[in-house]
Amino acid sequence: MTAQLNKVRRAIIDGCNPAMISDLLDDLREKNVLVDSEVEHIKESNNTNRDRCRAMIDSVKKKGDDPSNILLESLVKNHKTLAKSLGLHEPPMAPVPIQEHNADTIKNKDIKGVIPCSAEEFKKIQDTQGDKIYDVRKREGRKGLALIICNEKFENLNERHGAKVDLDGMTKLLNELGYQVHPHTNLTKTEMVKVMKEFAAQEEHADSDSTFIVLMSHGDRQGVCGTDSKKTEKEKGQYEVTNLLEIDEIFSTFNNVNCSKLRNKPKVIIIQACRGENKGGLLVRDDVASPPLEDDGLHFVQREADFICFCSSTPDTVSWRDPTKGSVFITHLIEKMNEYAHCQPLGDIFLEVQSLFKDKCPNSRSQMPTQERCTLTKKFYLFPGY
């Protein structure tokens, strides 16, 4: 459908008017093709109707066949005169309508994006779960933000080939879930801290109901590597990693004291990085070194609440990454989020991801994602597209 949209692109631009553009943008936003920030950018960054129409079409084209099809279908249904002049008399062959998607009738291999939550599913969950789930703001006023930091190239460590695949995949996933993504690449430890604090201070968090923080880099048991991290041998067989963003610092940045606008709202931390040397596979590792084993006791205080952290591996184990396809963890996470975000709480979706590793990697030393420091007090449903 991208080719068909490209074929009639010029004619649509020539025939557009302000009301038509407004209608189409509203429809694309309602059907989760464009997020609020994209719609506002199209409106505010273009001075003429033709420029707005051109920007809208080009934004949709970049997203692929299904979004292009939705735009053409909207044009046929709501602007019949123009559609007829373009030869678009029938709605193009479309995927299953957004409000009719059902995980039970769609095979996993056929899922190309997030399955939206239908009105029936939303009502059923609200009726049966009630006050057991986190509040969801109405879409019209919701401004969910997501932060992604993806380090690929380092001063002293190996390049993480395949990291761009993970970055693109997570950006697409979070956009489809309704979040405005703030992506950053190749940051030093100091830059990562600065970016996190700036993100935590965003005013839009006050109008959000949740946030995602995604960190993808090399790492070890204690944290995530910056591009300036370095591994040095202190004693024989014992290593120290410098310029490491520690896990505690991530949680501290977004706790109730330092990020009050996210108080009582789910804060999801996703970490794709190695945490040690134990291994059970043959791909590329996202590790630096394994420190001596220590007691890993965690102490929660009132200031740290409503977090859920999903790490790509258990402490002291490696995390595998394919140089061309991206990391195994991120690949499976996107797959299961696409499939179940419309009907299952996030914790259950994470269990689905873990089950894939259990089934495929029975060896206890193989990679196993783990949920850590979970202080959610309710179930967190994403309700994509609703």
Swiss-Prot record:
Enzyme Commission number(s) of this protein: 3.4.22.36
Stored InterPro entries: CARD, Caspase-like_dom_sf, Caspase_cys_AS, Caspase_his_AS, DEATH-like_dom_sf, Pept_C14, Pept_C14_caspase, Pept_C14_p10
Catalytic residues identified in the record: H218, C274
A single GO cellular-component term on record: AIM2 inflammasome complex
Domain of life, per lineage: Eukaryota
Ranges for domain CARD: 22-88
CDD domains on file: CARD_CASP1-like, CASc
Catalytic activity, reaction form: Strict requirement for an Asp residue at position P1 and has a preferred cleavage sequence of Tyr-Val-Ala-Asp-|-
Alphabetized UniProt keyword annotations: Cell membrane, Cytoplasm, Hydrolase, Membrane, Protease, Thiol protease, Zymogen
Gene3D superfamilies in the record: 3.40.50.1460, Death Domain, Fas
Name of the featured protein: Caspase-1-A
Functional description taken from the UniProt entry: Thiol protease involved in a variety of inflammatory processes by proteolytically cleaving other proteins, such as the precursors of the inflammatory cytokines interleukin-1 beta (IL1B) and interleukin 18 (IL18) as well as the pyroptosis inducer Gasdermin-D (GSDMD), into active mature peptides.
Example GO biological process: regulation of inflammatory response
Propeptide: 1-100, 287-296
Record family assignment: Belongs to the peptidase C14A family.
Top-tier EC class: hydrolase
GO MF entries: cysteine-type endopeptidase activity
Subcellular location: Cytoplasm; Cell membrane
Keyword Protease appears in the UniProt entry: yes
PANTHER family membership: CASPASE RECRUITMENT DOMAIN-CONTAINING PROTEIN 18 (PTHR47901), CASPASE-1 (PTHR47901:SF3)
Source species: Xenopus laevis (African clawed frog)
UniProt PTM: The two subunits are derived from the precursor sequence by an autocatalytic mechanism.
Subunit description: Heterotetramer that consists of two anti-parallel arranged heterodimers, each one formed by a 20 kDa (Caspase-1 subunit p20) and a 10 kDa (Caspase-1 subunit p10) subunit.
Predominant subcellular localization, coarse grouping: cytoplasm
Disulfide-bonded cysteines: none
